[in-house]
Amino acid sequence: MQYSQKVLDHFMKPHNIGKIENPDAMATEGSPACGDQVSIYLKVNAKTQVIEDIKFQSYGCASNIATASIITDMALGKTLEDAKKIGWKEAADALDGLPPVKIHCSVLAVDTLRKAIKDYEVKHNLAKADKFNKETIVEELKKIIYPQVGEDIVTLKMVKYAGFE
């Protein structure tokens, strides 16, 4: 598997790594199928809604660490609204590409950033918390990829929805 020099640089010397004590918001996302996990911590200026500090912790492969690193670089100094617009393709492009089997790492990093922003918005009454129901569970499970076949957990019917049948 060939990695770009930017991926290797962000993997070997990740930016914004660590944990913010008393963050304004945080989120942890992961994929049980591949074992990757990312946590993102935010400090946000309450008046301007600008991300003043952002840190991440990652458990995963080189692509996972590199995409979390680049996402934090891209979000730092942006308003929450602008940071929400950062997409997985933009993150992968900023790293000069990712191997096709590692694109899910940029999706995971973007999802984690958006969940951290949502956490901030909910805590500050800027958004409502998502409802917990069968549809939200199914949507979350569609993000979990079974790596040997590249299909999502829902399609493979590897789970049952306890209490929703």
Predicted regions and their residues:
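Domain-level signature for proteins that mediate thiol-based redox and metal-cofactor handling
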Residues: 1-165
